[in-house]
Amino acid sequence: MSEPWTWHGGDLSAAKRRFGPGDDPWIDLSTGINPNAWPDAESVDIDWRRLPERGAIAGLEAVAATCFGVAARHVCAVPGTEIGLRLVGALIGGEARYAAPGYRTHGEMIPAAMATGPDAIGRHGGSIILANPNNPDGRIAPSATLRDLLASRGGTDWLLVDEAFADVDPALSLAPAVGDDARLILFRSFGKF
């Protein structure tokens, strides 16, 4: 296994060395970033030379909160889902299950996490990590199932749902369940679509 803070993929030349050149051109999907930017992206006046100031981050979080229908105090902007997953995993630790097959980092974010089939994930204690829709197969967990999993979390257990691809159907999001007492952490992405 790679060190948790040093590897995220995206090395197309390494993949070609390992698996052979195959039929070119290769399509690199490792970042999840749409290579076809929205029209007129160059016309946006953004300062790419420095990090955003606290007020700008608070503004981003407020806009995201409005978009997702949650209170701004429940939003924390991070520089990508990958780092967010790893940071949260380092903070909560403990026993955990992650849905397999699934996104590789879900299995690495909490050292003691164990792979579990999607239909059996709620049969065990500990925190639960899954994506909805799932990455890589697109499997969708029914809202009722996720709400049941959330209701069964308590103590130090969390439901961690990676909603990086939830923009395909906003009704999939558990954002309406976010609250001060919910043992729920959602991960959203601005870079997928």
PLM-predicted stretches and their roles:
Residues 32-38, 81, 132-136, 166, ...:
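Short glycine-rich anion-binding loops that position phosphate/pyrophosphate groups of nucleotides
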Residues 8, 74, 83, 87-144:
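PLP-dependent aminotransferase-like
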